[in-house]
Amino acid sequence: MHLTRLNIERVRNLKTVALHGLQPFNVFYGANGSGKTSILEAIHLLATGRSFRTHIPKNYIQYEADDAIVFAQSATEKIGMQKLASGEQLMKVNGDTVATQGQLAKLLPLQHIDPQSTDIIDHGAKPRRQLLDWLMFHVEPEFYFAWQYYSRALKQRNTLLKTRRNLSLADLEPWNKMLSDYGEILHSQRLSIVEQWNVYFQNDLSQLLPDLEIELEYSPGFHTEQGLMQDLLNQHQKDIERRYTEYGPHRADLRLKTPFGHADDVLSRGQKKLLIIALKLSQIAMLHASNKETVVLLDDLTAELDLTAQQRLIERLSQLGSQVFMTTLDHASVKKHLHDLSISYQLFSVESGQVSLAAS
């Protein structure tokens, strides 16, 4: 879904923003604190229901306002989100209220590329698992269904473990069965997708880090040779003592292995940034191969990447048919890249929360 129109109300210092005739590349420039990253934040809020900067709605809803609103339109769809300071939200697709955030996310596949961040590599398994599950959600039709049932069973099992001390195997049996059934499905789905993803990943890795050997290695979170049910049975007493479920797909990881060790231990900060970009580009490539258009948020492109890496990234996103919303302090460099690559774009100036069309 490529956006032709974007309206933002009361997100941080953006009181009212109305953008029309959006292009494949949309570049926002201005001083630090002007509000340009808040535009990306608003698009992220629409697609995911949350900000990439804070988990607390009142932190991004304008001071003394009760809500924030984001509306977007493509050639065929209209989607909107009202977020209240309480955290409640109202979502609409083509004028009809929808119940789940997933319905908006399916229409608006979105990737956020922050060249300054190395969280996916340095901050443990959770962000890597989330990265994998973003891909699963968009390319594996049955994933969301299986994940919902697995998550429900995990929540119920953990609640029992936290609230009751003398649990028998019989007490946990219904949840063990559901965890095992749906956990094995999730494992099979993830394993298949990681194998496919690795092919795309190697292509983008070779463009950004041609001298590095890195493999994606999926760690399932349980002992697959004996199966999840056996792990749950074997860990029965220890789970009671821990008060949570130790084994299962919720503990899975996506390991990034080099011939010299794991990426978090052996790569430089600069290499880690390019590795994360390669991971996300390869995911976008997988969606592109299945005729799905991705919206990409690219924050502060020129701050961390050299000119060659900047141009390679812009060119690759254009090849993949992505619609890009990017921020920069150095719009002259970005304009040159876009002109050199003959890419259609719009340039916007952002100053104190006011957004205006600038000369391209």
Curated annotation (Swiss-Prot):
GO-annotated molecular function: ATP binding; single-stranded DNA binding
Main location: cytoplasm
Pfam family, one: SMC_N
A GO cellular component entry from the record: cytoplasm
Intracellular or extracellular location(s): Cytoplasm
Keyword field: ATP-binding, Cytoplasm, DNA damage, DNA repair, DNA replication, DNA-binding, Nucleotide-binding, SOS response
Keyword Cytoplasm: yes
Positions contributing to ATP binding: 30-37
GO biological process: DNA replication; DNA synthesis involved in DNA repair; double-strand break repair; SOS response
InterPro entries according to UniProt: DNA-binding_RecF, P-loop_NTPase, RecF/RecN/SMC_N, RecF_2
Keyword Transcription regulation in record: no
Role description: The RecF protein is involved in DNA metabolism; it is required for DNA replication and normal SOS inducibility. RecF binds preferentially to single-stranded, linear DNA. It also seems to bind ATP.
Family: Belongs to the RecF family.
HAMAP family xref list: RecF
The name this protein goes by in its record: DNA replication and repair protein RecF
Originating organism: Acinetobacter baumannii (strain ATCC 17978 / DSM 105126 / CIP 53.77 / LMG 1025 / NCDC KC755 / 5377)
